[in-house]
């Protein structure tokens, strides 16, 4: 009898009488920028021979719980620049991070590739569409590696769009040529940067660009992108263990506001992790 009476009272209540917790709409989103160095960790004593530990990479991505994850050097270059049709590291990342949608791309296959990292990925908790890729030619600057003269391979820009907080967001990811590693008379890959800026000019809505820009004198990079309407979330903290350079950036345009950011060292790579939280500007 008591149960029936309680049920009657509940049915007679209007919606205003019932205190129901309504989930608040998401108003901000988090971005993680990470050159994962194909899963090779960091060893202070012997960094060049540190073991590959993809489990540590996966743990870092999970720990930051970002809405958007931008990754560089996802795979390790194979002999003669070979590119497996099914990229093993990316495949494992997707299996372990099932909450994310993803887009992965290699740059153009090239037998001149050096035995480092290759491949870009965008991971997003919301579906991706409008995917693109654009090659970034490298100048034919001759340099020597392990006693062999060679020239650098081209680089890559990828992009995709998604809906976050009910708004459309355009996302780009890149990894530029490290001129400073070539000991060339030119210090920065200005030509590659200009192609990226050309691509950014085609977007009209909220846009962000992350990546490893490999610019040792980063203030020139920051100034160049600022003149085009893109700010970096930070330009003061070093993001690379091997040299005191600010190589990694997240740039954003005037339709986004950066609320906070962090540079966090990790044993999962020779690069630090850069995160930033954003909101859309009405």
Label each residue range with its predicted role.
Residues 1-96, 104-114, 187-195, 282:
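N-terminal, active-site-proximal structural segment of metallo-dependent hydrolase catalytic domains
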Residues 2-19, 198-208, 213-282:
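Metal-dependent phosphoester-hydrolase catalytic domains
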Residues 20-32, 116-120, 124-129, 146, ...:
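Beta-strand-turn-beta hairpins that frame and shape the catalytic cleft
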Residues 29-36, 57-83, 123, 160, ...:
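Active-site beta-strand/loop signature of hydrolases that rely on acidic residues for catalysis
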Residues 39-41, 76-80, 110-112, 178-182, ...:
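Active-site environment of divalent metal-dependent phosphoester hydrolases
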Residues 40-48, 76-78, 136-150, 176-187:
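Surface-exposed cleft-lining segments at the edges of enzyme active sites
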Residues 83-101, 121-124, 222-234:
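Short, electropositive alpha-helical surface patch
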Residues 100-143:
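Catalytic-core segment of enzymes that process non-peptidic bonds
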């Amino acid at each position: 009898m008591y149960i029936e009476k309680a049920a009657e009272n509940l049915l007679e209540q209007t919606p205003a009488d019932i205190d129901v917790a309504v989930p608040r709409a998401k108003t901000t989103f988090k971005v993680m920028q990470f050159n994962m160095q194909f899963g090779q960790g960091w060893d202070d004593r012997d960094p060049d021979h540190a073991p590959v530990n993809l489990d540590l990479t996966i743990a870092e991505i999970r720990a930051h719980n970002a809405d958007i994850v931008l990754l560089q050097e996802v795979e390790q270059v194979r002999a003669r620049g070979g590119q497996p049709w099914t990229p093993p590291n990316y495949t494992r990342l997707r299996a372990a991070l099932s909450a994310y949608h993803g887009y992965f791309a290699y740059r153009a296959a090239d037998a001149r590739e050096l035995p480092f990292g290759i491949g870009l990925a965008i991971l997003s908790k919301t579906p991706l569409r409008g995917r693109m890729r654009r090659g970034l030619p490298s100048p034919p600057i001759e340099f020597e590696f392990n006693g062999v003269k060679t020239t650098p391979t081209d680089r890559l820009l990828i992009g995709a769009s998604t809906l976050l907080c009910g708004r459309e967001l355009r996302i780009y990811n890149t990894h530029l040529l490290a001129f400073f590693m070539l000991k060339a008379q030119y210090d920065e890959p200005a030509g590659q940067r200009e192609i990226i800026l050309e691509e950014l000019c085609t977007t009209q809505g909220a846009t962000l660009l992350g990546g490893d820009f490999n610019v040792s004198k980063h203030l020139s990079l920051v100034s160049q992108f600022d003149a085009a309407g893109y700010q970096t979330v930070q330009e003061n903290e070093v993001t690379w263990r091997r040299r005191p350079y600010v190589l990694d950036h997240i740039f954003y345009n005037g339709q986004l506001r950066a609320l906070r950011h962090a540079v966090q060292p990790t044993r999962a790579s020779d690069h630090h992790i850069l995160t930033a939280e954003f909101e859309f500007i009405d």
